């Protein structure tokens, strides 16, 4: 592993999901870069899942972290969702929300925003319940392994979703390319790959804790996805940076790729 890049053990010991959620997802009227980015991401995911052709039965979310925002529109297009993450504390945080336990993070402002994007077909609490029903499993994952979800037996997915994950999990470009190929093993022929990530970011902060990120430009991302065997159907660059004290990214991207072959 590249010297100085945040290790897996550091994530297990130092990644605080509550601090992360409060820093990046305390969505509200306050004008800040983090809120603006979240709005962009929610709009992009709405377009991909509700206005586009990305639909099916099974979606696997790779590197979910402690968040559910990325799945709010996806649950309109997929009947079964599997969430996954490397760190146990993120999986516990997801379980707290799924089980509506005391102290679970309040996603209601984000959910209300997505309901508004979707034309207010349902109220926030209904949307949250719909997503809870869709999430069938919470699994451990490691994108650096040839079997990212370990030995769990699953049908090939119609869609893989990965938001703000791969650049934090891969210390260098060869590892990034390998991770993309590893993920392909979970996807059925003709299945979709939906990715969202920061561009040219070498770190991000959670409180006083700095976590490494692999700084990639959009051309490098595009080439790596294509070299891993996917056809890119959509690629959008979001020209919004995080706060300077949070990250040194130069925008973000979202893409929709497709694995070769015909889906059943």
From Swiss-Prot:
Post-translational modification: Deiminated by PADI1 and PADI2.
Record-level Gene Ontology MF annotations: nicotinamide N-methyltransferase activity
Keywords linked to the UniProt accession: Citrullination, Cytoplasm, Methyltransferase, S-adenosyl-L-methionine, Transferase
Description of how activity is regulated: Inhibited by 6-methoxynicotinamide (JBSNF-000088).
Gene3D superfamilies attached to this UniProt entry: Vaccinia Virus protein VP39
InterPro entries: NNMT/PNMT/TEMT_CS (IPR025820), NNMT_TEMT_trans (IPR000940), SAM-dep_methyltransferase (IPR053384), SAM-dependent_MTases_sf (IPR029063)
Cellular compartments annotated: Cytoplasm
Domain of life: Eukaryota
Cellular-component GO terms for this entry: cytosol
Sequence positions that bind nicotinamide: 197, 213
Statement: the UniProt record of this protein carries the keyword Cytoplasm: yes
Reactions mediated catalytically: nicotinamide + S-adenosyl-L-methionine = 1-methylnicotinamide + S-adenosyl-L-homocysteine
Pathway: Cofactor metabolism; Amino-acid degradation
Binding site for S-adenosyl-L-methionine: 20, 25, 63, 69, 85, 87, 90, 142-143, 163
GO biological process terms held by the UniProt record: methylation; nicotinamide metabolic process; positive regulation of gluconeogenesis; positive regulation of protein deacetylation
Tissue/organ expression: Expressed in white adipose tissue and liver (at protein level).
Function: Catalyzes the N-methylation of nicotinamide using the universal methyl donor S-adenosyl-L-methionine to form N1-methylnicotinamide and S-adenosyl-L-homocysteine, a predominant nicotinamide/vitamin B3 clearance pathway. Plays a central role in regulating cellular methylation potential, by consuming S-adenosyl-L-methionine and limiting its availability for other methyltransferases. Actively mediates genome-wide epigenetic and transcriptional changes through hypomethylation of repressive chromatin marks, such as H3K27me3.
Assembly, per entry: Monomer.
Similarity annotation: Belongs to the class I-like SAM-binding methyltransferase superfamily. NNMT/PNMT/TEMT family.
NCBIfam families reported in the protein's UniProt record: GntF_guanitoxin
Listed name of the protein: Nicotinamide N-methyltransferase
Organismal lineage: Eukaryota, Metazoa, Chordata, Craniata, Vertebrata
